[in-house]
Design a protein with these regions (language model features):
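Alpha/beta hydrolase fold serine-hydrolase catalytic domain that processes acyl esters and thioesters
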Residues: 3-14, 22, 26-34, 40-76, ...
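Gly/Ala-rich beta-loop-alpha elbow adjacent to hydrolase catalytic centers
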Residues: 169-174, 178
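Active-site-adjacent helix-turn-beta-strand microarchitecture at beta-sheet edges
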Residues: 87
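Short glycine-enriched nucleophile-adjacent loop
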Residues: 178-187
Length: 368
């Protein structure tokens, strides 16, 4: 009877749109440099934001000024963002030795929930880490280990009796890090409820076999949401059945004043921004759709060659793919033994394409 008139306030978690906005703004200078946002809110980020290119001449997440204005307006017009407090920003490690392209990990508090978010691939350090993730002898990588250490530290520091739920999220490599944490800590931490990964790549066979029990226990808590034309979520093997695709829209960004055009066009297709639709200058996540045929073909092909290539060929292949997006000091981030193709690699590679084409109906050599 004491509780007859008592109604517990049920607070809804952040929406998918709000999580995607957070993952988008992690690419901005305000999160990448310094600690000035710690103790402030996401709405404060909007007030302090200044549009600028990074040291390599990139837009933040390949989002141009016109597009970023819509991100700002979205944050301004939703009062939820003024209630999301930024507890911690870790940007102390960089993707290049000169300090550019920081690796960013952020902890946020909203009502009685903690959100731990991870930015996507940063510089040569993490592109090399992506290639190493494909090695059959790799169980987990240095970047995944560091993400787990950050999560553990934040969990210990901020998850007390007042916190009811914890969520992990990230875009691209950050999405993979958040999935990794859900697998490793999902059974141990009952408050860790969900992982929301955006365009996160998969895992190698060794990891999936070693952690098969943990994956089975936690895969229903992992959501991987990707753009229909995204080329990162197709890499390696996905560990969740909760894979959603949303319609992507991109104008490839503005190319004016750009130095790294190839990186920019690649980046524009993979940017978190492509998953938004706009109405009256305010952004929401776009409609659900199917994965594009081209990306489905790429996914099948990557799985085929990983299964059929020699170990040395596959290691070279993944380092070669990663190196496209390493913009400087390449020799530091590509092991010496994988800077040149193994003898006969291209002949074998063309044979793989031919054999894959025979196995898959309605796929042309040109598509591959």
């Amino acid at each position: 009877r004491i509780f007859k008139n008592f109604k517990e306030k049920i607070v809804k978690r952040l929406t998918i749109t709000q999580l995607l906005i957070i993952n988008t703004i992690l690419y901005t200078t305000e999160f990448n440099v310094g600690q000035k946002l710690v103790g402030k809110t996401v709405r404060d980020w909007e007030k302090e934001f200044k549009f600028e290119l990074d040291s390599l001449g990139h837009f933040p997440a390949e989002i141009n000024e016109t597009e970023m204005e819509k991100v700002l307006k979205t944050v301004r017009e939703d009062e939820t963002y003024s209630k999301i407090k930024i507890l911690d920003v870790n940007n102390s490690k960089s993707g290049y030795t000169d300090g550019s392209e920081p690796i960013v990990m952020v902890t946020l508090k909203y009502e009685d929930m903690i959100y731990i978010a991870f930015k996507g691939t940063a510089g040569g350090v993490e592109w090399k880490d992506n290639a190493i993730a494909a090695y059959p002898e790799t169980i987990y990588t240095e970047a995944q280990k560091e993400a787990l250490e950050y999560y553990d530290k934040m969990y210990e520091k901020y998850v007390d009796n007042t916190i009811k739920k914890v969520y992990v999220t990230g875009h691209s490599k950050g999405g993979n890090k958040s999935q990794f944490i859900m697998v490793i800590r999902g059974s141990k931490h009952s408050k860790l409820k969900r992982c929301f990964s955006f365009c996160g790549q998969g895992f190698n066979k060794t990891f999936i076999e070693k952690y098969s029990n943990q994956i089975q226990e936690n895969k229903d808590k992992i959501y991987n949401i990707s753009a229909d034309n995204d080329y990162v979520n197709v890499i390696l093997t996905q560990i969740t059945d909760k894979i959603k695709f949303v319609k992507s829209t991109t104008n490839m960004g503005e190319v004016a004043k750009k130095r790294a055009i190839i990186r920019h066009k690649f980046g524009a297709l993979h940017s978190p921004y492509v998953m938004f639709k706009e109405k009256n200058g305010v952004l929401t996540i776009n409609v659900k759709t199917k994965q594009s045929k081209l990306m489905r073909t790429l996914q099948l092909f990557l799985a085929y060659i990983l299964e059929n290539m020699t170990i040395e060929d596959s290691k070279y292949f993944y380092h070669a793919m990663s190196s496209i997006l390493i913009e400087k000091e390449k020799e530091k981030y590509i092991p010496e033994e994988y800077r040149e193709a193994p003898s006969g690699f291209y002949r074998r590679f063309i044979t793989h394409i031919y054999n894959f084409q025979k196995e898959e109906d309605n796929i042309s050599f040109v598509q591959i």
